[in-house]
Design a protein with these regions (language model features):
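Contiguous, non-catalytic segments that form substrate-binding/exosite surfaces or channel walls
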Residues: 151
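Acidic/histidine-enriched alpha-helical segments
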Residues: 66, 122-147
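Short, surface-exposed helix-loop/turn micro-motifs enriched in polar/charged residues
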Residues: 40, 61, 128-131, 135, ...
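Active-site His/Glu-centered metal-binding helix of metallohydrolases
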Residues: 48, 52
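Active-site glycine-rich loop that binds ribose-phosphate moieties when present
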Residues: 183-187
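N- or domain-start disorder-to-order transition segments that initiate the globular core
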Residues: 1-27
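Catalytic Zn2+-binding segment of zinc metalloproteases
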Residues: 53-58
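M16 family metallopeptidases and their MPP-like homologs
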Residues: 16-18, 24-37, 43-45, 63-118, ...
């Protein structure tokens, strides 16, 4: 059964809940849908989910963040980028055990919701209002390494090139994470 549990039309936010006794885990995710306009914009957006999932204002370093996730029975945070047609989808998600398996009636799902809210609305910024430089550079390097790995995986690379050629000059032809050149120029 799916219920709309939160809706804010002013910012286009809608939250749904789908409960089932079939699974032992809970997953909360936020999907930010952005138009694909240029490879540079795609590259800039592609860095955001992973760097946002590293630290927040509430959990300013990886150790504090990891400790909180461990307290929630080994919960985890996931980030990613995908593309559907002319849209780039930035995904941030938190997963953990279902509440019925927590000791003492602890509300793990509420804690996961707080963590996800913190990632989406209060990511860690430096005094200039930018992502911390070291974390940003690490995620930029990681994104470049992912593109290199795709090149070495021939089926993925062939699909990517086919899409680029079929949709050349159109938003759907822009790679979901931008191009190597665009990723290198992101600041």
């Amino acid at each position: 059964m799916t219920n709309t549990i939160l809706e804010r039309k002013d910012c286009g936010l809608r939250a749904f809940a789908c409960e089932t006794p079939q699974f032992k885990t809970a997953r909360l995710s936020a999907h930010l849908v952005l138009p694909l306009t240029t490879p540079e914009a795609a590259a800039a957006h592609a860095v955001v989910p992973n760097i946002s999932a590293r630290a927040t204002r509430e959990y300013p370093d990886y150790t504090a963040f990891g400790k909180r996730l461990a307290e929630l029975y080994g919960a985890s945070v996931h980030a990613g980028v995908s593309r559907i047609g002319d849209s780039q989808i930035l995904t941030l998600a938190a997963s953990g055990i279902a509440n019925r398996y927590a000791f003492g009636g602890e509300d793990v799902q509420a804690a996961l919701a707080e963590i996800l809210e913190s990632i989406v609305f209060t990511p860690l910024f430096d005094e200039n209002g930018l992502f911390p430089e070291d974390g940003f550079r690490q995620e930029q390097r990681q994104l470049l390494e992912t593109l290199d790995a795709e090149f070495n995986e021939k089926r993925i690379y062939a699909k990517r090139r086919c899409t680029e050629l079929m949709f050349a000059g159109e938003p759907a032809g822009i790679p979901q994470s931008g191009t190597r050149e665009a990723i290198r120029t992101v600041t």
